[in-house]
Amino acid sequence: MFEFEPDRIYLTESGYRQLEAELKRLQTVERARIADEFRAYKEHGEFSSEDTELESLKSELAYVEARILELRNVLQNAVIVREADIPTDRVGVGSVVTIEEVDTGTQKQFRIVGAMEADPEHQKLSYQAPVARALIGHRKGDVVEVTLPKGTVRYRIVNIEK
């Protein structure tokens, strides 16, 4: 078990592996592909200041290099939440939480994950999201208030699991 510190970067083990795979792909496959395109362009084209294809390649390379730096930084500084460290007695990073909106009875279930692995369409909510921030540290049965753009909403924690 670890003590949650909101200013740290957290990743689940699977999120860490996904970012590692993305970093490896960018460093090998994407860099090589862009380099090949530069070589092919150099062999067949004349460079000019208005060359949109060349500018597009430069922009793509800049994006790839910036993403590589970002991923390296995140992977070096992240706190990895191991499966064994995911709490079930209180909400934490890695927890699968079922909540119920007190006023409507509507239930939602999601996993609280690191910001870099958040994917709301697949029920993966960043620990930095307002709902997740409000839930972290609370226990099953607790009612928490969350201030959202639509107003204050009260949620009851129905279940917490790994």
Residue map of PLM features:
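Short, charged, intrinsically disordered terminal tails
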Residues: 2-4, 158-162
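N-terminal intrinsically disordered, low-complexity, charge/repeat-rich segments that act as generic
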Residues: 1-77
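Non-DNA-binding regulatory cores of transcription-related proteins
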Residues: 81-155, 161
